[in-house]
């Protein structure tokens, strides 16, 4: 019994340490975020080792923004629906071989290279998801499987 209690405590501390932040968010990162998203609410930060990710909301839209360790903006992902994407993207998806699959998630991805892409997640079955990335012109850029 005593061994089980000790084992449980060790597991608890291991899980807690994995979820802990490794370092403080640099001021350059938070200042860059505040300058870019002054009206953001519910901001939470994640340390991704080579970058920092802010999860937040603006006008009830769920967003994620990634910054370098020096505070340079890398990309922003905004949750949306297939109905809210440009007509070209909608048409590109409808013409794809995955159009019959149920759409699980849609993200608008804006990058520092001034390109906007749309990531559509479709669920084939309980064990198989496909991540489809479209250009703003509706061309499928990538098609990845997640098991």
Residue ranges: model-predicted function:
Residues 21-147:
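Interaction-mediating elements
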